[in-house]
């Protein structure tokens, strides 16, 4: 099954809240910091393939944070494999930091705090 969530058609003042809610439903609770919340654009397409899901996320500059407060309600332990397609991504978890360019990949662990950002 394919699902697409977009900010197109969402009032500018409501876009950052809309994106925050969409990301939480698609993945798990995260804090989001927008470079330009008043003019944010994003699109998330997801495919559910049994126990595995794929997603393609494109958006304006943004930082995602998975913090200890997000672990209050237990959930399944998940791993996300991230492959940048257009720009460098920055990811920090467990005292390590990675900057990945298109062609590289990294693994995110949902059950530990992390920080993920991109500037484009």
What feature does the model see in each segment?
Residues 2-120:
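N-terminal functional module of multi-domain proteins
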């Amino acid at each position: 099954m394919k699902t697409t969530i977009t900010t197109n058609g969402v009032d500018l003042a409501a876009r950052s809240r809309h994106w925050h809610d969409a990301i939480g439903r698609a993945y798990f609770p995260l804090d989001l910091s927008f470079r330009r919340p008043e003019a944010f654009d994003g699109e998330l397409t997801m495919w559910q393939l049994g126990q595995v899901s794929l997603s393609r996320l494109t958006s304006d500059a943004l930082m995602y944070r998975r913090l200890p407060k997000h672990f209050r309600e237990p959930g399944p332990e998940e791993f996300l494999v991230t492959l940048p397609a257009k720009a460098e991504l920055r990811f920090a978890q467990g005292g390590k930091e990675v900057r990945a360019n298109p062609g590289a990949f990294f693994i995110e662990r949902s059950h530990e705090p992390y920080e993920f950002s991109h500037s484009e």
